[in-house]
From Swiss-Prot:
It catalyses: ATP + (deoxyribonucleotide)n-3'-hydroxyl + 5'-phospho-(deoxyribonucleotide)m = (deoxyribonucleotide)n+m + AMP + diphosphate. It holds the Pfam family REP_ORF2-G2P. InterPro entries: ORF2/G2P_dom. It comes from Bdellovibrio phage phiMH2K. Belongs to the microviridae Rep protein family. This is Replication-associated protein VP4.
């Protein structure tokens, strides 16, 4: 999806970059940046984070999708307390790397989202931890989708605030953790709760970096990433920034050829989706055929598209 409120920029007469349309020189090239705040931008960000997390999981033998909850005894606030998770991940790092030299320390990339229950508004954490799986994993239950869920005394002792359970890292679980970007925008204040969700990633180990370092040639020669179901997805912005920084000459070639072709195909698909969404909207209204303004049409299409992507991201 394309940004609906792009930030326009260009050059003034002296060659400086300016963002005011009044100051932009018409004789020089102008361009636009995604706002990163509108619904399409937020959904794109969530999707890109999910793709990067899934790719990160492919680079390690062991990964877990972990849920950390609070019991009544340790629920000291109805707000998320970042220090609780921060101390947990530090204890895990210390436990796994105790006695090891800096060169031999085990990297522990993670992506975490803290949110509130839909009904109880109770705070809890969902974490993707890469390059780790506890040795004492015990089967806990099987979900309706047939996925095995485990528990671990090792992790419980490190968490100290309540119950824990974990499963496998898949594109679905990665999408679940990455959904914060769309959810925060959709509900404003995390549904009816007046507290925002928290999202963070490991600072030392960029999510997806190992994957793009290994597969950048295939990825940028195609101009897209291949998802587990065989479908094609856009190359995440982080991958593009990495490629531009580390392979500037190849980036220029990609930007001039493959990226242009990918953009044209994406725009064609976007127009098709908009027509389909509008047709569905008209059908939903019972075939009523009274005039709609351009704004009403755009909002109708966005709402339909947003609902589809919410379902896809399991919002």
């Amino acid at each position: 999806m394309h940004c609906i409120r792009p930030i326009k920029a260009g050059f003034n007469a002296t060659g400086d970059i300016v963002y005011s349309s009044k100051k932009i020189s018409k004789e020089l090239a102008s361009f636009a940046f995604p706002c990163r705040k509108c619904i399409p931008c937020r959904l794109n960000m969530a999707r890109e984070k999910a793709i990067r997390a899934y790719h990160e999981s492919q680079m390690w033998d062991d990964n877990i999708f972990l849920t950390l909850t609070y019991d009544d005894e340790h629920l000291k606030s109805d707000r998320l307390q970042w220090i609780d998770f921060d101390l947990f991940i530090k204890r895990l790092n210390e436990k796994l790397n105790r006695g090891l030299s800096k060169e031999n320390r085990r990297p522990l990339p993670y992506m975490v989202t803290g949110e509130y229950g839909d009904k109880t508004k109770r705070p809890h954490w969902h974490v993707l931890i890469f390059n780790f799986r506890p040795d004492d994993a015990k089967k806990h239950y099987v979900t309706e989708l047939g996925e095995q869920v485990y528990t671990s005394e090792f992790i419980r002792d490190l968490w100290t605030h309540g119950n824990i359970e974990f499963g496998s890292v898949t594109l679905d679980s990665a999408s679940y953790v990455a959904r914060y970007a769309a959810k925060k925008l959709a509900h404003g204040n995390d549904q009816d709760h007046d507290y925002h969700p928290i999202h963070n990633t490991s600072k030392k180990h960029a999510i997806g970096k190992k994957w793009i370092e290994k597969y950048h040639e295939q990825t940028f020669s195609r101009g897209y990433v291949v998802l587990p179901n065989g479908s094609q997805g856009p190359i995440p912005r982080y991958y593009q920034d990495w490629y531009k920084k580390n392979h500037p000459e190849k980036w220029m070639e990609y930007d001039a050829k493959v990226k242009l072709k990918s953009k044209e195909l994406a725009e064609m698909q976007s127009r098709k989706d908009q027509l389909d969404d509008f047709a569905n909207f008209i059908n939903y209204r019972g075939g009523t055929n009274y005039p709609l303004s351009r704004t009403q049409v755009k909002l109708a299409i966005l709402k339909s598209k947003f609902k589809q992507l919410q379902e896809k991201l399991k919002l």
